Amino acid sequence: MKENKAFTHLHLHTEYSLLDGANKIKILAKRIKELGMKSVSVTDHGNMFGAIDFYTSMKKEGIKPIIGMEAYIHNDDNLSSKETKQRFHLCLFAKNQEGYENLMFLSSMAYLEGFYYFPRINKKLLREHSKGIIASSACLQGEVNYHLNTNNERNRKYGAKGYDEAKRIACEYQEIFEDDFYLEIMRHGILDQRFIDEQVIKMSLETGLKIIATNDTHYTMPNDAKAQEVAMCVAMGKTLNDKGRLKHSVHEFYIKSPEEMAKLFADIPEALENTQEIADKCVLEIDLKDDKKNPPTPPSFKFTKAYAQNEGLSFEDDASYFAHKAREGLRERLILVPEEKHEQYKERLEKEIEVITNMKFPGYMLIVWDFIRYAKEMGIPVGPGRGSAAGSLVAFALKITDIDPLKYDLLFERFLNPERVSMPDIDTDFCQRRRKEIIEYMIEKYGKYNVAQVITFNKMLAKGVIRDVARVLDMPYKEADDFAKLIPNRLGITLKGYEKNGEFIEGAWELEPKIKELVESNEVAKQVWEYSLNLENLNRNAGVHAAALVVDSQKELWHKTPLFASEKTGGIVTQYSMKYLEPVDLIKFDFLGLKTLTVIDDALKIIKTQHNIDVDFLSLDMDDPKVYKTIQSGDTVGIFQIESGMFQGLNKRLRPSSFEDIIAIIALGRPGPMESGMVDDFVNRKHGVEPIAYAFKELEPILKPTYGTIVYQEQVMQIVQTIGGFSLGEADLIRRAMGKKDAQIMADNKAKFVEGAKNLGHDGQKAANLWDLIVKFAGYGFNKSHSAAYAMITFQTAYLKTYYKHEFMAAMLTSESNKIESVARYIDEVRALEIEVMPPHINSSMQDFSVAEFKNQKGELEKKIVFGLGAVKGVGGEPIKNIIEERAKGDYKSLEDFISRVDFSKLTKKSLEPLVKSGSLDNLGYTRKTMLANLDLICDAGRAKDKANEMMQGGNSLFGAMEGGIKEQVVLDMVDLGEHDAKTLLECEYETLGIHVSGNPLDEFKEEIKGFKNLVKSIDIEELEIGSQAYLLGKIMEVKKKIGKRSGKPYGTADILDRYGKFELMLFEKQLNALEELDINKPLVFKCKIEEQEEVARLRLFEILDLESAREVKIPKARYKDPEKQKEDVREIPPMEMLASSSCSLAIVLENDVKKEFLRQIKESALKHQGKRPLYLIIKDKDKQFKIQSDLMVNEKIKDDFKGLEWRDLA
């Protein structure tokens, strides 16, 4: 390592100058050290995103970090002014803590108040917050240099005024910063820089301002230049071949050595020395927190005194008020606890209060208590708990959680360990729809700048960087896609392997030999690979963390973190990412939006409307056999956490019969336990196939709920405590070490465990064997507290599906109404439950899916789900609200009645058209075709009616005021055009609903598609194993063709419909050519392979077959994740009209010589399979057929008893 005392880089862009700077901080730190430099600055564009990452990385390498930013500044006194787009660059550096806080404030205001294309500050703000800050005139875009550079035509055009103006501005900055303003010169070989060089030196002599020499550094090594260009192209959506793209004219923007800089500035060595002067002035030391030596400051509730006074109490501090609320809450909870156990609860509570108080976390607990209290008061659904907090009795007493930790043997030490100082971490689930209200409450309570969400940085990871770079290099789409798919689907995969803790972790290069073959045989692929290696893991863009929120009740957040404004949400976000918030003394709270809570809330509201019942989940019978029967059947679509194919199979195998079993299912249903044999042990022991044995009798109470199998982390802790004599705090530390596979700690503690066991009178060898067993399963162990809390939601949803299936499934459909494929899937599930879904209609539909009673063929009332108007694409909330409000006065009797009553200032042509196309205005006197042809006439009539109403009610018309508006109905002059053909109707329905109502495009091909076995449904694609072969039958609805920019070859996508929904396939030239030989107006069979792309199952097309060719192929069974589903023999595609299907009649076709005995068998079967479909007999006699209606109502399962016969659906 060389040593340098004369130069510090003061103009440097890291990876946090998103896709402009390409200096990866960890690599940068090593390079600075290698070049012998003792200090370095960061000046990212307009932000401080990377300040703490930079600070800690440089400190680790023994380099002095200088925190700065290259600010954007404009000259309007109104910071938020949009009058001018002109902005200049100015480099700012924090000298000390005051300067650092001022810098954070300036950066925050640039985003929150000054943002206009870029985050901007102005000189007024700069004057007010300049203390502790050093500034320099920046690059050619700096204001001083801009006016000096009259050689540049663009500068002259936009107002560059020359030397005198530049000097005036320099003196203005000198007046603001005094001796801490420096003139900056750069020498990259750019003509404009040479033009201003002498003028800057002249200005320095005339003003006494010192000069610093800088290099506008955007990447680390000289050979990184091209990769940085590629990154810029990714940011702008350009390719390297695009003309006029933004690019550097020279390749000099790398980390130059002190020697290189000395050579460049040999004529002005003081410019180098002055960089060191700035470095010496900067003495900032950031007080970073860590759990061990310098723990973060626990947050204060701040409102304790006011809250206590409201309750007529007197508490001055958080601790005493917290203890009071916890004890008060426990008294309420103990009402449902047997009296003989009260003392146990009180002792546990006091122990927890003591630990929380000693660790100084009462304020934290009160903050959480308060926002959950508010949510519940406002009727915002809150989850029963999440994570390790469910193990705390205090949390249960404060109603932060709703799971009794003593009842389910949950451990407080899993939440807070008194032997290891770490911040509590309570994650809270809220109704997804209303989560925003809780954030708004926090902002209102603590202050606009005291609450913020947390920034995230999306990185260019292995697959993504290949795709990005391939696009920039104009690689044909299919080649790029194939290249990216070579990257193995493995969590945390990197392009090349690396060493970690002495272990070599293989990357894609080592795992997939085809990558090497491709890179060595294809020049473009080689370039893609090389640039991708350079850019991998670079920050791509900024986002917002899905859950995290930080709160400081004492002062504005910019004292600890600069702030950022999210373009997506408009909300305030920290500039520091999650990893760096605790070090700067900020504690995060997680507010998660859980869709299931919204579904439950909607279901409860429908139940209240339908039955006037308030379901109380806290008083449910947790041993209800009907609920467990639902779960055991595998009928778990819509049931929280256990609805996937894998869980359905697990439910059938395990057959849960207690709440403890549900807790275990959630813990077991993960790849680790499934692959380790834990699940087999659990199932076999539960059902008596294997004996339950305990190595020590003391283990029975710990392992009995899981049939002798170690399933939970808490069990590991209890075993270590009970057999080895450890405290639960020590046991928690061992659990953590096992999770991290820390070999040394585990080896040390094994000896301690065995010795402890011996001291307690246990056999040492048996203890050693037990330790090895613990180590084996600890890696798969799950947090029981989390599992128990989520099992509560599982039970609640299973209860609703068992007892209120119509209401529950209506709520499920509402939750998915913006996802076509999901609606199709759930409607399929509704059909399986023999629930009829009525199409949307203005006289029966609400905003959301709802439940209503209709008379059936026998005149009996029957519950059905009604399609929600909100699920009709393109209508909008306001028109629907108006339609429903007006309908409360009575159903719409005709189209004229509808027009005369609805407000057409809200119902526009754009909203009316999807209502007509979806069938929502059927039975109002006109066909859809007629209404669609007369949309303008209908809207004109509606607006004319609105205008007339306005005049009549105005009080100043010729007729005076008419109460109630126009009483006469609108008269329409529309010619009946008949109805569209079936194909057009179906297309309109699919366009507006995402599904077909009046039939299915495959209906006309029913006979042709009979008899195929083992076809995969589109809704089951996610249930298939990756790598499995799948055959799907469907009809192509649309083909979108494109031409590859570079290859010039055609490619495209096809939207394909089967009886269950839609799926998409990528088509390349070969497949597009194949389609030209096929009749795409008929169903086709698609041979595909299941691949994983970005953790989602995708179909890769191999072959397209017409039906005739497909019949000659022996279609193999697809491989499902659920072994039970694998056993199914998928035969004919069942008839499926997605809506109102159960009202269709079912007919069995018989020959005219049918025997009476056979008819008796049919009747017995019909009585066994009673349902809602009228049963007909079709008797064939030569070329004639006779249809006979029976008095029997059946379901689909009757077909299974007579598989050899023909069945038909009758409208």
From Swiss-Prot:
Pfam families membership: DNA_pol3_alpha (PF07733), DNA_pol3_finger (PF17657), HHH_6 (PF14579), PHP (PF02811)
BP GO terms, sorted: DNA replication
Cell inner membrane recorded as keyword: no
GO molecular function: 3'-5' exonuclease activity; DNA-directed DNA polymerase activity
Group of enzyme by EC: transferase
InterPro entries cross-referenced by the UniProt entry: DNA_pol3_alpha_NTPase_dom, DNA_pol3_alpha_thumb_dom, DNA_pol3_finger, DnaE2/DnaE/PolC, DNAPol_HHH, PHP_dom, Pol/His_phosphatase_N, Pol/histidinol_Pase-like
Keywords assigned by UniProt, alphabetized: Cytoplasm, DNA replication, DNA-directed DNA polymerase, Nucleotidyltransferase, Transferase
EC code: 2.7.7.7
Location in the cell: Cytoplasm
Transmembrane stretches, start-end: none
Reaction(s) catalysed (UniProt annotation): DNA(n) + a 2'-deoxyribonucleoside 5'-triphosphate = DNA(n+1) + diphosphate
GO cellular component: cytoplasm
First-listed, main subcellular location of the protein, grouped into a coarse class: cytoplasm
Family: Belongs to the DNA polymerase type-C family. DnaE subfamily.
Assembly mode: DNA polymerase III contains a core (composed of alpha, epsilon and theta chains) that associates with a tau subunit. This core dimerizes to form the PolIII' complex. PolIII' associates with the gamma complex (composed of gamma, delta, delta', psi and chi chains) and with the beta chain to form the complete DNA polymerase III complex.
Protein function: DNA polymerase III is a complex, multichain enzyme responsible for most of the replicative synthesis in bacteria. This DNA polymerase also exhibits 3' to 5' exonuclease activity. The alpha chain is the DNA polymerase.
Protein's recorded name: DNA polymerase III subunit alpha
Upper classification of the organism: Bacteria, Pseudomonadati, Campylobacterota, Epsilonproteobacteria, Campylobacterales
Gene name of the record: dnaE
